[in-house]
């Protein structure tokens, strides 16, 4: 039995979240009656309202009066008045991942998992399948610039989704094709240990059907080890590793883009082919790897090489993934969502490879618990930045932790040899700090998952204002 077509209204608590908004949008396009509430009147809420979805700003019990079903995200607390009201009314309450899983039953599905790179890889898979005339439905964890949204309703048989591992619910997703980009220590507040995280990814791969396949990056040692523990499922490996089935070679990262070619070697004896002259208009080895994962899926699903090449060259990127926000005095300002040390290191390495100028990193650490658990990694992930400007920690609802803050990170950076790490006292001081350091050909990269994205977009104008 599939989700009844006449079920509704379906009420989303936290409808403005990036994951929730995508599911709500696709369900509305499928003909379901959808409504929802959010604490903030953000861009996602406004977009949904413009598309005819009933939205409420603020959480109140009366918002669920006519609901037949309630969908909640992991960010919603048990004392939320709408959730309390729904349970008093004995309404079915489902998690975001459960509703996503129901949608996935309508299509054949590609699920993209991994600690980093999920959103970009999901966008790339969608782009390549679209180029192959497969017209996929897409539910992503970020805004795909070509669509102007994080969700897209396609007429084809395939769906591409970002599989969020943060609370373990990605194990509920019925994927036919799985991608694992990497596995690093993250979300330890939920999993408790790195071993539990690795076990969850193993089960994620085991869940694919016998007729499906998994695409896994063996450049990452934890993923390569996981490959050795998977039995009875088809695995396609990718990476720069000479043993990869889909191998990234001859990569050139100059000029703010990635040029490379890919060699495909099937386990069938004698099969080998190359796809040459690939250009991705995004810098960074990590993005070339993301593109290789997407290429592996597209090739397996029959997308021609010429279509892959053309689609990669025209890829419009994802919002908040090395997004250019403006220029000042010959320097270019970027906004990036990177908030884990591995992500920060990859972004700054890409910036370093793309310019002959200086790299200035502005970081707003996200969550005290993350800074505490990965403190040593944070102290060493900024080596490719000539200057690091550190803002106060974005708490995301957490209580402060003694000895874990902006100043301790600055001290840690300096203790490990960084030559220029400075404190940002207030957002209003940022333009002055940058103006004293940035010049022609420099890259100014704003990093974090909090309010720093607003600073990144305001910074070009603020710098111009300093010059009068």
Curated annotation (Swiss-Prot):
Gene Ontology terms: cellular component: cytoplasm
Catalytic activity: UDP-N-acetyl-alpha-D-muramate + L-alanine + ATP = UDP-N-acetyl-alpha-D-muramoyl-L-alanine + ADP + phosphate + H(+)
Origin superkingdom: Bacteria
Pathway(s) this gene product operates in, as recorded in its UniProt entry: Cell wall biogenesis; peptidoglycan biosynthesis
Biological processes annotated in GO: cell division; cell wall organization; peptidoglycan biosynthetic process; regulation of cell shape
EC number of this enzyme: 6.3.2.8
Location within or outside the cell: Cytoplasm
This protein's record includes keyword Repeat: no
Single GO molecular function: ATP binding
Keywords: ATP-binding, Cell cycle, Cell division, Cell shape, Cell wall biogenesis/degradation, Cytoplasm, Ligase, Nucleotide-binding, Peptidoglycan synthesis
Matches recorded under InterPro entries: Mur-like_cat_sf, Mur_ligase_C, Mur_ligase_C_dom_sf, Mur_ligase_cen, Mur_ligase_N, MurCDEF_pg_biosynth, UDP-N-AcMur_Ala_ligase_MurC
Matching SUPFAM superfamilies: MurCD N-terminal domain (SSF51984), MurD-like peptide ligases, catalytic domain (SSF53623), MurD-like peptide ligases, peptide-binding domain (SSF53244)
Function description: Cell wall formation.
Family indicated by similarity: Belongs to the MurCDEF family.
HAMAP family, A to Z: MurC (MF_00046)
PANTHER family recorded: UDP-N-ACETYLMURAMATE--L-ALANINE LIGASE, UDP-N-ACETYLMURAMATE--L-ALANINE LIGASE-RELATED
Protein known as: UDP-N-acetylmuramate--L-alanine ligase
Organism, scientific name: Methylorubrum extorquens (strain PA1)
């Amino acid at each position: 039995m599939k989700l009844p077509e006449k079920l509704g209204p379906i009420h989303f608590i936290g409808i403005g979240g990036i994951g929730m908004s995508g599911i709500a949008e696709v369900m509305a396009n499928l003909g379901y009656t959808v409504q929802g509430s959010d604490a903030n009147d953000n861009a996602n809420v406004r977009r949904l309202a413009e598309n005819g979805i009933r939205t409420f700003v603020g959480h109140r019990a009366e918002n669920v009066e006519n609901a037949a079903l309630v969908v909640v995200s992991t960010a919603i607390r048990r004392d939320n008045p709408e959730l309390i009201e729904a349970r008093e009314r004995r309404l079915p309450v489902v998690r975001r991942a459960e509703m996503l899983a129901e949608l996935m039953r309508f299509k054949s599905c590609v699920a993209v998992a991994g600690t980093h790179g999920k959103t970009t890889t999901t966008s790339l898979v969608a782009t390549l399948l679209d180029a192959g005339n497969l017209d996929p439905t897409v539910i992503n964890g970020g805004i795909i610039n070509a669509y102007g949204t994080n969700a897209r309703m396609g007429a084809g048989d395939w769906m591409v989704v970002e599989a969020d591992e943060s609370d373990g619910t990605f194990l509920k997703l019925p994927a036919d094709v799985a991608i694992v980009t990497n596995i690093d220590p993250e979300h330890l507040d939920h999993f408790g240990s790195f071993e539990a995280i690795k076990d969850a990814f193993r089960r994620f791969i085991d869940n694919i059907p016998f007729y499906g396949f998994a695409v896994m990056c063996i450049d990452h040692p934890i993923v390569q080890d996981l490959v050795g523990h998977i039995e009875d499922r088809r695995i396609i490996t990718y990476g720069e590793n000479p043993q990869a089935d889909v191998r990234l070679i001859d990569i050139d990262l100059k000029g703010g883009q990635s040029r490379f070619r890919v060699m495909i070697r099937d386990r069938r004896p004698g099969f080998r082919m190359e796809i040459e002259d690939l250009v991705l208009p995004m810098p960074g080895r990590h993005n070339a790897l993301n593109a290789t994962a997407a290429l592996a899926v597209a090739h397996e699903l029959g997308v021609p090489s010429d279509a892959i090449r053309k689609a990669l060259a025209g890829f419009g990127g994802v919002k908040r993934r090395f997004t250019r926000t403006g220029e000042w005095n010959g320097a270019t300002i970027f906004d990036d969502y990177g908030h884990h040390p591995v992500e920060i290191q990859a972004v700054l390495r890409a910036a370093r490879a793309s310019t002959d100028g200086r790299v200035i990193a502005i970081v707003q650490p996200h969550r005290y618990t993350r800074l505490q658990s990965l403190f040593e990694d944070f102290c060493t992930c900024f080596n490719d930045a000539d200057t690091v400007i550190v803002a106060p920690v974005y708490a995301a609802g957490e209580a402060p932790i003694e000895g874990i803050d902006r100043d301790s990170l600055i001290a840690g950076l300096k203790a490990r040899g960084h030559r220029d790490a400075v404190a940002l006292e207030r957002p209003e001081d940022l333009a002055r700090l940058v103006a004293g350091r940035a010049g022609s050909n420099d890259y100014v990269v704003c990093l974090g998952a909090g309010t720093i994205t607003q600073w990144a977009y305001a910074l070009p104008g603020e710098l111009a204002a300093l010059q009068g």
